[in-house]
Amino acid sequence: MARTVFCEYLKQESEGLDFQLYPGELGKRIFDSISKQAWREWMKKQTMLVNEKKLNMMNADHRQLLEQEMVNFLFEGKDVHIEGYVPPTE
């Protein structure tokens, strides 16, 4: 049976992650309170950020920026702003 969590991003019970994907205390917080669906949404935003801002994960400042954006997105309800990006309309 799938593990469920109360997802802080979706504000509802949802299927939890299978294992801790991020190290440290932040990783534990993500594992305990972020759903698979919310994590997938973050991964899309992360990919856009890395590509559009040309982030280098070998650079500590870039990793710190990405981590802060992740916290803002998953826990503080702030959307990721990517200059020049216009979401598609349905």
From Swiss-Prot:
GO cellular component, alphabetical, reads: cytosol
Gene Ontology MF terms in the entry = iron ion binding
* UniProt keyword Membrane present: no
Top-rank taxon: Bacteria
Cite the Pfam families for this sequence: Iron_traffic
What InterPro entries has UniProt attached to this entry?
A: Fe_traffick_prot_YggX, Fe_traffick_prot_YggX_sf
Function according to Swiss-Prot or TrEMBL: Could be a mediator in iron transactions between iron acquisition and iron-requiring processes, such as synthesis and/or repair of Fe-S clusters in biosynthetic enzymes.
Q: Whose protein is this, by species?
A: Pasteurella multocida (strain Pm70)
Q: Which family does it belong to?
A: Belongs to the Fe(2+)-trafficking protein family.
**The protein's name:** Probable Fe(2+)-trafficking protein
